[in-house]
Each structure stands twice: as C-alpha cells, then as structure tokens.
Amino acid sequence: MRDQNGFTLLEIISVLAIVALLAALILPAIPSGTSRARLEGYALDIAALLKGDRSAAIRVRAPVATTLNAHSQTVRSGADGSIVQLPGDVGFDAILAKRCGGRPVGATIDFFPTGMSCGGTIILSRQNVGFQIRVNWLTGGVEIVSADKS
C-alpha cells in the first residue's frame, strides 16, 4: 500500500512536468499583439488628447498644435505635452492639411481659439481592423470611425 501511494505521486509529478513542457512549447506560438479592443482604446486615447488640445486652445485663446510623429508612432499634445505611444504592430498614418491659415503645416493638427482646426484624419490599423480619428476643420470636432477591412 505504501509503495502504491508513492507511485501515484510520481505519476502526478510526471504529468505536470509534461504539461509544463508542452505549455512552454505551445504558448510562444500563439500570436500576441494588439487586439481590436486595445486598438480602439488607442483611438479613444488619441481622440481625448485632441479634444483636450482643442479645449486648451479655446481656454487660453491661443493656437495649440498636436504633433504627429509617424517614425516614433507618437501623438503629442501641444497643451500639456502628454503622449500617446503606439506599439510597433499598429499601423499609423495620417491625412493632414498642407496649408492652414495661409502658412505651410507640418505633421500637426492645429486648433485655434475659435474652436476651428486645420482638420485631419489619423488612421490606426492592425491586420483587418482599423479606426480613423477624424478632426473636422470647421468645427474642430473629433470623431472615431471604424475602418475595418473585412
């Protein structure tokens, strides 16, 4: 009887070791990356940053520029310097005005004290999922639109 109990314990330990080995081999093969929900979260973060910059421009009665950097995949607030950093597996593109207020515009979305903006669209994508963050040039309003490619 005593020998049988020890043998059962040895079987359980062996099975657990095999399961752990299989998990170590299989788990890295499961694709990890930005989910649809997290991609939408990034879109919401960027929209909130843009809305904050618009509000700051109205509040301080001075233009505020939100800076987009495609190389580092960042969106930086012109009001408080906060940054939304996108991971490398997220596609990041923007459609921006070439001229605004009679002057050339770089990689920024400018907001004016009147609430107006130069407008633009920021596009986030991963595989067949995408979101557009659109800034209306006339009202400065910000909206998020699903842009799935399925």
Predicted segments — roles?
Residues 2-3, 13, 21, 25-59, ...:
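N-terminal helix-rich module
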